[in-house]
């Protein structure tokens, strides 16, 4: 774009000189532009096309990285998600399809959508992502196959009132920055096929996971069983962390912290 700006200034100077010369010769400025302006305009368009396109693609990639989980957590509390079950009853893949489609700027969600579109064609080696879909146990995950933690994990529980509680846990790891993590919970109403943020369950989990006495946390959503394992990390003053584990037991509607 710097080349285009210098080129525009040069064109402006040339235009001024041409106007002065053509005025003296009795020609209009429009006549002068018809012979010189058109080829130069083509050149300018060509330059802008070849240079601006890569910059645009790079900018898009930077935005996706910079947003991280903020693009999801920034407005999820007020966002309802519509689910389109493929069968008579919604399953974990239906929940994942709906959630990841709503928040498809996050890379693990993109990969999960790609897998769900055609599981047999999904190449985990090429994609550098692995997707586990365990429909019978109501669990699905999309994880980056590197030392960096970057994933989306989901599962659901059947509630006493006939609804489902859908849980989501995400970590967005980075080589250069501290990892982001977030958990979300939704109440799914099968009568309306709508996922509504469940802030009551979130508050229960927050009391344990966001304990200020610890530096960080991670949730282990159950692939088998019904309880959530919470890992709390504290800096041990050396080159690592001490881990404290707590258990949130499913009670049919929400979770109860198991006394130590």
Regions flagged by a language model, labelled:
Residues 33-157:
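Terminal domain-start segments
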Residues 2-14:
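Bacterial N-terminal signal peptides that target proteins for export
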Residues 153-161, 217-224:
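Structural signature of eukaryotic scaffold interfaces centered on beta-propeller domains
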Residues 143-145, 171-179, 236-239:
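Short consensus segments that form the blades of beta-propeller domains
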Residues 162-198:
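Mid-length scaffold segments of soluble, non-membrane domains
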Residues 194-260:
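Short aromatic loop motif centered on NTY/YTY
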Residues 21-24:
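C-terminal motif of bacterial Sec signal peptides marking the signal peptidase cleavage site
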Residues 26-28:
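Long, low-complexity intrinsically disordered regions enriched in Ser/Thr, Asp/Glu, Pro/Gly
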